[in-house]
Amino acid sequence: MKNLINQITVGIIGILCLIIIYGLYTLSDMSIINEDKKLSKITEAKEFCKENSYNQDFCILIDMSVHSGKKRFFILNLKTEEIEKSYLVSHGCGNSLWQGDLTKTNPIFSNVENSHSSSLGKYKIGDRGWSNFGVNINYRLHGLEASNSNADDRDIVFHSWNAVSDKELYPNGTPEGWGCPAISNNAFLEIDPLLRYSKKPTLMWIYK
């Protein structure tokens, strides 16, 4: 009887070890995939900014494939190709509850007016203006692709929001708005001078 119990125990331990090893390999593979994607985006962003006479010091990348409770808004130094800062950022709630987090793992994207959804694609960060939200500053976003061509008509802007945290919230998600990329007040105050005094337009690229 004791031998049988020992055999069962050893078997269970073996299965648990296999599960852990498989999980580690899976995480490793995901890390490689994400790193490859990041390198690809960095290369394309650099080429775009150079060819279109955009700001070649930095740009903003937002990776919507990342859980919204994790930092997925990146300030990319185009000179060093390094991520200098990362922050939480909201996405649009779509048909879900405003300020909820029901689509924290699977955002719905749309270019349609009143869809309350975020739009993927490259944006030109435009004029600085007054905002009802956060620190009362926003920047117009001009869509440069078919997937975000209605950004102007939809009044899509980059702004801060009191509801967005400075710290990661995972497994909870960042509160969802009506389609504008919104970051915390403190994060916005760090970025505002970079955008305000840039002599060339700055790229914001939202992708997944």
Put a short name on every predicted segment.
Residues 1-16:
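N-terminal Sec-pathway targeting helices
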Residues 23-178, 185-202, 208:
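Cell wall/extracellular polymer interaction/catalysis modules
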